[in-house]
């Protein structure tokens, strides 16, 4: 079994760019940014429980890494960068720390490196279970209306929230809930030490208005790029700013 993905081919000899979306996104999420790099072959992946991979269920990050590894092999991707937002960034960091043959580097936008104590994990587990129950039982428009009121999305205006609620409500609530629980921050290890000892290139992007993740970025041994005029979802709020940072990283 492999993950559903859309592949776009570029010039031979350059590494692939493998894009991983955030929670409730899909393979289209990164395409406005990715298509600015037409010289590079691009793979836009649907994570388990999402988009064309909605029917794929996992028990945890190890399963996600295994599926990602098999997907890369199926497309004969031998050299690549992982580019991930939020959940996709956490998947990218986990997979990179577990080891992926051919990995050139990891570019993470607003991805959490992991909670640092049992109390934080227990609190997050309670929260994610409550959200998962709502995703399973309530209309998605109602759940996402509340989801985008969370502090991390404080930089969004009302129109942006309405647009995101409408877009994300096309998902399957049950499969979102399952993926939320399987890849909760409550079950993700703290990756700070692994990332400090890494053997791959590591870059971190965060919006200038995303105070939580700017603070987290300062804790990581990563080259950090702050995206102007953006909050947590920087590639959506300022795609040109993210394109500029990726171009600098890739020496485009």
From Swiss-Prot:
Domain of life from the UniProt record: Bacteria
User: Record's Gene3D superfamilies?
Assistant: alpha/beta hydrolase
Report if keyword Lyase is assigned: yes
InterPro entries for this protein: AB_hydrolase_1 (IPR000073), AB_hydrolase_fold (IPR029058), SHCHC_synthase_MenH (IPR022485)
Q: Does the keyword Glycoprotein apply?
A: no
Pfam families hit by this protein: Abhydrolase_6
What does the record give under GO molecular function? 2-succinyl-6-hydroxy-2,4-cyclohexadiene-1-carboxylate synthase activity
Give the record's keywords alphabetically: Lyase, Menaquinone biosynthesis
What EC number(s) does this enzyme carry? 4.2.99.20
According to the UniProt record, what class of enzyme is this? lyase
| Pathway, per record | Quinol/quinone metabolism; 1,4-dihydroxy-2-naphthoate biosynthesis; 1,4-dihydroxy-2-naphthoate from chorismate: step 3/7; Quinol/quinone metabolism; menaquinone biosynthesis
Recorded catalytic reaction(s): these are: 5-enolpyruvoyl-6-hydroxy-2-succinyl-cyclohex-3-ene-1-carboxylate = (1R,6R)-6-hydroxy-2-succinyl-cyclohexa-2,4-diene-1-carboxylate + pyruvate
Task: Give an example GO biological process.
Answer: menaquinone biosynthetic process
Spell out the family assignment given in the record's similarity comment: Belongs to the AB hydrolase superfamily. MenH family.
Q: Which NCBIfam families match?
A: menH_SHCHC (TIGR03695), PRK11126.1 (NF008340)
Annotated function: Catalyzes a proton abstraction reaction that results in 2,5-elimination of pyruvate from 2-succinyl-5-enolpyruvyl-6-hydroxy-3-cyclohexene-1-carboxylate (SEPHCHC) and the formation of 2-succinyl-6-hydroxy-2,4-cyclohexadiene-1-carboxylate (SHCHC).
The record, for HAMAP family, names: MenH
What is known about its subunit structure?
Monomer.
Q: What is this protein called?
A: 2-succinyl-6-hydroxy-2,4-cyclohexadiene-1-carboxylate synthase
The organism is Escherichia coli O139:H28 (strain E24377A / ETEC)
The gene designation is: menH
């Amino acid at each position: 079994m492999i993950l559903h993905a859309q592949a776009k081919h570029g010039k031979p000899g350059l590494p692939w760019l493998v894009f991983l979306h955030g929670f409730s996104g899909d393979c289209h999420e990164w395409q406005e940014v990715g298509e600015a790099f037409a010289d590079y072959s691009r793979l836009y992946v649907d994570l388990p429980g999402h988009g064309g991979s909605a029917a794929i269920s996992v028990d945890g990050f190890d399963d996600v890494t295994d599926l990602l590894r098999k997907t890369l092999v199926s497309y004969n991707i031998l050299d690549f960068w992982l580019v991930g937002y939020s959940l996709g960034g956490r998947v990218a960091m986990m997979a990179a720390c577990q080891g992926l043959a051919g990995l050139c580097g990891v570019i993470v936008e607003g991805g959490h490196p992991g909670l640092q104590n049992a109390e934080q994990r227990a609190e997050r587990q309670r929260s994610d279970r409550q959200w998962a129950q709502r995703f399973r039982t309530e209309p998605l428009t109602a759940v996402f209306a509340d989801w985008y009121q969370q502090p991390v999305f404080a930089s969004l205006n009302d129109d942006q929230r309405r647009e995101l609620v409408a877009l994300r409500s096309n998902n399957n609530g049950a499969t979102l809930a399952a993926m939320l629980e399987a890849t909760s921050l409550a079950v993700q290890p703290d990756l700070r030490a692994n990332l400090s000892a890494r053997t791959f290139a590591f870059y971190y992007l965060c919006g200038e208005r995303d105070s939580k993740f700017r603070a987290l970025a300062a804790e990581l041994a990563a080259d950090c790029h702050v995206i102007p005029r953006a909050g947590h979802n920087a590639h959506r709020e300022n795609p040109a700013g993210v394109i500029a940072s990726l171009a600098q990283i890739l020496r485009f």
